[in-house]
Structures are given as structure tokens and as C-alpha cells.
Amino acid sequence: MIGSFLTRGLVMVLGYAYPAYECYKTVEKNRPEIEQLRFWCQYWILVACLTVFERVGDAFVSWVPMYSEAKLAFFIYLWYPKTRGTTYVYESFFRPYLSQHENDIDHSLLELRTRAGDMAVIYWQRVASYGQTRILEILQYVAAQSTPRPQPPQKRGGRANQAPAKPKKAPVPQSEPEEVSLSSSSSSSSSENEGNEPTRKVSGPSRPRPTVTSVPAADPKNAGTTQIAQKSVASPIVNPPQSTTQVEPMQIEEVEGEAESGNENPNPEGPKETVMEETIRMTRGRLRKTRSEESR
């Protein structure tokens, strides 16, 4: 058996190349013979039909043994000068079949042309509409990309990159009246005296009282340090003079009540009494000075 590759090469040479060269020689003669031209036209008609059908028939008949060799032999049979098989096959099989179905074939070809034209128009419209929509989408996309969009504020990580926040102004605390705090012994004694003596009510709005630091009961050893601490008592906070005459009697009464409470509660320790008396005297003196200055 000849290989399929070699068989295909021989079919191309002996079935197409050599007959084409013989047809060329016949056409280029000074006086071409009509019979020779007719013969080669019939040959090429049969070869064209074989080429069309072998594309489909090879898938079903190529498994037959010696199929490629038989096809090569048939091509040689058609043009070989001694056999001249083209004339026999054309006149016996091909021409009678075509003459019988020529009208049907022409009608089918006309319908096929009409349908092909309609299908071409329909597909052209679809392609045009699709291309138009796609072009519009592309133009819209390009226009959207060209217009600048407002960029959202980027969140910067880390505390170092954050802008320093403006310090909020703290609300100014309102001055509240501060109560005079004394030692435990003096407070207890003053509470007892308050139970016995009626309290005096002062009309008008309450005013802030002067702050007096508490003087705890100190040991005799630490008497020197307590005296130094008592001398550094802060001066009373003086607000704008608004009805000072009502505030001053209250301050004097409180100081006198504290002095009386200090005198009523005898303390066996001498240094403590002297410290309290000195504190009361200093406070009275300062109150009198402030009162005289405000009255001026």
C-alpha cells in the first residue's frame, strides 16, 4: 500500500497540475480545437464535483481499504488519452442528471440568493445597531473618565499625620462659697453652740466667703511648723463690691462663733490654744482691714 501522504501528493500533481498544464496548451494554440476545449471543460466540471463531495464523503468512506489509491486511479482515468473517461462519465451520468433537475436547481438557487440577500440585510442592521450602541457606550465611558470627580478625603493613618484638634475652651467654673473648715475639735464644739444659739438669716443673694485653711490639731513638737502654715493663709477672694455690708457681719459672726467654740472647749494642751487664738486674731485683723478698705 502507498502511504496516504504520498497518495495525496500524487493526486495533486496528476489530478490538478498536469491537466491544468494540458488545458493551457490547448487554449494557447493558434487555432484551438473545439473538441479539445470541450473535453477539458467537461473534465474540470467533474473534478469540481468530486472535490465538493469528497469533503463530506471522505469522513464516511475513507476507512475503506485502497480508497486513496482508487481516487488517484479515477483522476488518471478521466484525462488519460487512451481511456478518455471524461467523455463517457459526463455523457452517461452527469449530463442526464443535470438536464433532468436543471429547473429545480435554478429555482433553488434563485430562492437561495433572495434569502441570502434578506439575511445579509438583517444581519447588517443588527451589526449596525450593536456597533452604534457600543460606540455610544465607549463615548460615555470616555466622557466620564475625562470629567474630574471629587475625591473623598483620604484617611491618614497614625496620630502624627492627624491635624491637631482645636482646644476646646473649658467652661469657667462659677465661684462657689467655700465653707470654713476647722479642726475636728473646733467643728464639734461649733455644732454644739449652733444648737444653742439661733441662726441669723441674711437677706439677699449669697456671696462667696473667704477661704480659711483648716488647722489640724498638732502635737507640741510640731507647733512651730503649724504656726508657719497658719501664717501662709490665703487672702479671701474679693468679688466686685455688691452689698458687702450683708456679707461682712456674717463673716464676723462666724469668726466670733469659732472663737467662742474654741474657748468653750478647754484643751489641756497649751500650745494648741495659743495657736488657735493667734489664728483668730489674725483673721479678725484682716477682716477689719478689708472692711475699712471697702467702706472707703
UniProtKB/Swiss-Prot annotation:
InterPro entries: TB2_DP1_HVA22 (IPR004345)
Residue numbers spanned by region Disordered: 146-296
Pfam families linked: TB2_DP1_HVA22
Disulfide bonds: none
Biased amino acid composition, Low complexity: 180-193
Composition bias type Polar residues, residue spans: 223-233
Chain intervals with Acidic residues compositional bias: 251-261
Biased composition (Basic and acidic residues): 270-281
Family to which the UniProt record says this protein belongs: Belongs to the DP1 family.
Name of the protein in question: HVA22-like protein i
Taxonomic classification: Eukaryota, Viridiplantae, Streptophyta, Embryophyta, Tracheophyta
Gene: HVA22I
